[in-house]
From Swiss-Prot:
Localization (cell): Cytoplasm
Listed name of the protein: Acetylornithine aminotransferase
Upper lineage: Bacteria, Bacillati, Cyanobacteriota, Cyanophyceae, Synechococcales
Outcome of substituting residue 126 to A: Loss of N-acetylornithine aminotransferase activity
Biological source species: Synechocystis sp. (strain ATCC 27184 / PCC 6803 / Kazusa)
Family note: Belongs to the class-III pyridoxal-phosphate-dependent aminotransferase family. ArgD subfamily.
Amino acid sequence: MTYSPVVESVEAQAFAVTDLSPAAEFKTADFDTYVMNTYGRFPIAIARGQGSTLWDTEGKSYLDFVAGIATCTLGHAHPALVRAVSDQIQKLHHVSNLYYIPEQGELAKWIVEHSCADRVFFCNSGAEANEAAIKLVRKYAHTVLDFLEQPVILTAKASFHGRTLATITATGQPKYQQYFDPLVPGFDYVPYNDIRSLENKVADLDEGNSRVAAIFLEPLQGEGGVRPGDLAYFKRVREICDQNDILLVFDEVQVGVGRTGKLWGYEHLGVEPDIFTSAKGLAGGVPIGAMMCKKFCDVFEPGNHASTFGGNPLACAAGLAVLKTIEGDRLLDNVQARGEQLRSGLAEIKNQYPTLFTEVRGWGLINGLEISAESSLTSVEIVKAAMEQGLLLAPAGPKVLRFVPPLVVTEAEIAQAVEILRQAIATLV
């Protein structure tokens, strides 16, 4: 394959990492004493990064195919992001949304001009963006559609939409809801990519008075096992929404901002949402979230929703740097080429171990390798073995390995990652 001019230009800038010596001794016991136990952490502590490489506190290097879970769009210490954040924090890092924030307006304009949206609301995370979408849907149902009954939002089984009470309720995975009753009312679930089940559910809920206010889906399910949406399914979803005055909402928190080889995941499906959300990769690792909508459903008024930190100058400067770099360096070309290369390499591994792996799937640089249900191996076991060999991966459920490297990953790094994975698997079988 041809070597992307994007990657050449990134490498030519020579990321400046001045000290790769081991950091001061890090004690996990001290960390665990003071930090709440909300993550099952792997036993390494990350000290610094450059491009697609991370170093731990002992000086060991790793190829980073987690990227903060699809968040470090430009990798680590990218000059454009470093420059944007450094310049902005010396000028103005935060001011209230009681005033106009030029960087926020500029970022909103860029997003609108490069998407199907007309308006943008900024917040700080994917969960917050999805909360904003849920509130917008409910207000639209009450004020525009004049619902007589409680609005219902349909989401997919095996979905993931966040960790707040509303978003774990929207998430179609009971394991995330356990112990958090009472959940937020107004949600129901259908199997992903199943047209008949969706049609039946809408018909059942709308019998008598309309109740379905929105259908809320991921274009590709990330936490649900890296499962791409089916074109025929999403075309029918759009038709159902149009025929029944139902809003179509897409959660693009993990797949948006070029991750799939297109700027937005919905571009793979041939339909446009009425509302969609973004976060993770939008500012390359600087906390940000965004909820976008078309003008007809922009029913928020002052006081309906807000965010203290949402759209602050620092996060918006970072977001602009990421998006302009994606566009200016033609990173989508690199994502498509490196994604094809990665899937080809994973397919070779699957063919080498036909009883261990069943499927390679994904778009661009979000890909999954599924482990056979008959195998005793789990995704976490392979993740640990790969980490020992110097490759960081993330599980997407107990039987799926997830590959989400930075969008600047090189041809050589993809080849190296595939070889490391091959070696790691060999230690387990």
